[in-house]
Amino acid sequence: SLRMHLETADETFMDASTHGRIKPARVWKALYLDNPRVFERKDEVETPGFSVDILMDASSSRKQMQQKIAAQAYVLSKSLTNCGIPVQIYSYCSIRGYTVMHIFKEYDDYGVEDELFHFVAAGNNRDGLALRAASHLMELSPKPKKLLFMFSDASPQDDQIAGEGAFYKDREYTDALAVKDTVNEVQRLKNHGIDVIGIFMGSAH
């Protein structure tokens, strides 16, 4: 859970102070400028030691909920960013057999969350392939620990026949086969130390 990841790493900064270890180069300030801050003190600042990625299912089954999905991702991103946690956001859908990743926000972007309101749902969804792509995008994280939120209806499906390179080649990406592929990719992420949290966004009906 997110609470488990709220472990912090202490970063040490040297700051001018009225007490601590004397800094000879600053003594003249006390003599001529009446500035008593001629000492150096270590200040420890707690900073989050992890980053968060938000992966949104943008398939057509999400059409009736696309505004709600965008709003939830917006609030989550703003809250995390305000806590100093790097956030990356992207969506995925499959169109004519190709999985498309739309990046709304990268880790070092600030104030771009409004882009989420351009979120549009269309096409199918190969969840396993999207998770594999997410693992590559998360390699850009500036933090050692990584957490992935996946907004999904937990129903991976694509009726386009897969081509070369997929274990489900020449078969439709549906039912048990699609679920197995998704589970395998989640496990692969976990094996690489990435925690995955599914946020179920079911049918609006």
Predicted region positions:
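Acidic, glycine-rich A-domain
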Residues: S1-H205
